[in-house]
UniProtKB/Swiss-Prot annotation:
EC class name: hydrolase
Signal peptide from the UniProt entry: 1-24
Gene assigned in the entry: mspA
Cofactor(s) of this protein: Zn(2+)
Pfam families registered for this protein in UniProt: FTP, Peptidase_M4, Peptidase_M4_C
Organism field: Legionella longbeachae
Protein name from the UniProt record: Zinc metalloproteinase MspA
Active site: E366, H451
Superkingdom per UniProt: Bacteria
Binding-site positions, Zn(2+): H365, H369, E389
Protein family (similarity comment): Belongs to the peptidase M4 family.
Alphabetical keyword list: Hydrolase, Metal-binding, Metalloprotease, Protease, Signal, Zinc, Zymogen
Cofactor note: Binds 1 zinc ion.
Keyword check for Cell inner membrane: no
UniProt GO BP: proteolysis
Amino acid sequence: MHHNYYLSPLAVALALGMVSPAKAADPILLQNASFSEVKQKFALSTQGVAVAKDSLSFVSEHTDRNKVTHVRMQQKYVGFPVYGGYAIMHSMNTAKSLAATTQSTVEMNGVVYQGLQTELGQPDASFVQNADKALQQFKAKYANQNVGDEKVIPMVYIDKDNQAHWAYKVSIRVNHLDKAPERPTAIIDARTQQPFVQWNDIKTERVSVKGSGFGGNKKMGYYEFGKDFPYLDLTRDANNATCYMENESVKVIDMKHKYSSVKAAMSFACSTTDSDIYSTGYREDNGALSPSNDALYAGYVIKHMYTDWYGVNVLSNSNGSPMQLVMRVHYGDGYENAYWDGEQMTFGCGDRMMYPLVSLGVGAHEISHGFTEQHSGLEYYGQSGGMNESFSDMAAQAAEHYSVGKSSWQIGGEIMKESSGYDALRYMDKPSRDGESIDTADEYYSGLDVHYSSGVYNHLFYILATKPNWDTRKAFDVMVKANMDYWTPYSSFDEGGCGVLSAAKDLGFSLNDVKSSLQAVAINYSKCH
């Protein structure tokens, strides 16, 4: 079977001799470092290929409205990525000119590690060859299951004590017949074959014509597209008189209460009309009139929110073109969840506790996991995982504000059944109201579920958005910019707070308001540059 490996020529050439750790790696907090110091210690590779033992390799760049270019770079040691080593350079220089510049005006954030040569030496000659062994051992835990999309990345892992280790990041996709898929992911010690950390990386939660139809559920009320909300954008094939629940931006797939499906859009017969407006009809399911209509509309709103407010695609293809949002509805049997799997959004129809999960807020949440994945890449465990979840909750409130001009400050309130005993899944004004989430960073402990650690940044967002002269849009402006230009995959709550301050400064917003909001949730900004 073919597996995906991520290696550079230098990595293979230098795989010569593994040694035991001698001392801890030395972290450099980049917001307090000088650009000249970093250039002396690390070769800057703007082509993404490591050319020296200690290097920073280009990942992506983004130029904001202030003409500042934010260049993301992954640390590599002898060609292998360093997990936790990540830099973002902020200057008037593009990535191509950054390596040659001598300017002291380059600002930075992130963390990189020096001293890896002393601690690690060179990897053993079998390090690369043993990558498949690590993957197969990890895969063996899921024997007799439907496994695919296997990946292994040889790397350097920095643990919580700043000890560096040769390691492998392994992941597989496990498809189930009776429940949602999983993406078990782990970082494995190359010496002991034991995991340092592990988590599930599935993030939960033709000719154009117009469509009319119904949406909503018993709790939020029912409404009509073409009357209460805009007409739906459809595609019609005149040759076979068929309309498709698809447009350039969004495609809706009917899972028919199964766990796998074809990739074709939902369709229905539609004879020619004088107005070129076609009734989608509706398929009532668990108290909702038409989950497919709601999904198509939610995708439209979310995509346009990111475009109208920020001039960016909510999701992009590898060539930078807009990615069509794929919304899979009627998923599974009694499935009370929704998730983003790296390619598409999937929505269950609920059961006893929930109505179908195709509300605007839930859709914005799942789609925005993809936005985070394509920008900061916040890892989905620990404090960065809480930030990842929280950004998607923020996006849910932003989508409500974009659509109806106000935010509910509840997550999932519109889909919870009255008989469930719950009025929402999470609360941004007081996260601890759900009995599990934390309100402040000093309440965090290792192993806390990311849906509960999200309370810190959810609370921060609410406090900031409700300050005088602020609103949901303005607060989301700050968080989007922090996600795009300042957060790294490994950001902690405090490091993320520095990114929020930097984003607010770039946008010309009140730093005192941001600082007081950070302080209210016990995020320490004293070390921010």
